[in-house]
Amino acid sequence: MVTIRLARGGAKKRPFYQVVVADSRNSRDGRFIEKVGFFNPTAQGQAEKLRLDLDRITHWVGQGATVSDRVAKLVKDATAA
């Protein structure tokens, strides 16, 4: 099953997440199909906190991909802003 979820990157105590489309059987930070955005929870000042390609996310959801709880919340926040 294909899922849209967060893949963690960044340094220790400084998380940075890529929003990726991946097979649910692959590991969290492992192989993915496509990057559809990023989320930087520690962004300060003028730094960009969230960027999502909503067209690609809706495409993958239309193809049957499931969305993780956290990504669903991020998409909701992005569409409201």
Swiss-Prot record:
Entry-linked InterPro entries: Ribosomal_bS16, Ribosomal_bS16_CS, Ribosomal_bS16_dom_sf
Q: What Gene Ontology biological process does one annotation of this record name? A: translation
Query: Which residues does UniProt assign to the signal peptide?
Result: none
Q: Which UniProt keywords apply?
A: Ribonucleoprotein, Ribosomal protein
Q: Which GO terms describe its molecular function?
A: structural constituent of ribosome
Pfam families per UniProt? Ribosomal_S16
Its Gene Ontology cellular component terms are: cytoplasm; small ribosomal subunit
Query: In which family does this protein belong, per the annotation?
Result: Belongs to the bacterial ribosomal protein bS16 family.
The record, for PANTHER family, names:
30S RIBOSOMAL PROTEIN S16, SMALL RIBOSOMAL SUBUNIT PROTEIN BS16M
Q: Which NCBIfam families match?
A: S16 (TIGR00002)
Task: List the protein's name.
Answer: Small ribosomal subunit protein bS16
Specify the species: Colwellia psychrerythraea (strain 34H / ATCC BAA-681) (Vibrio psychroerythus)
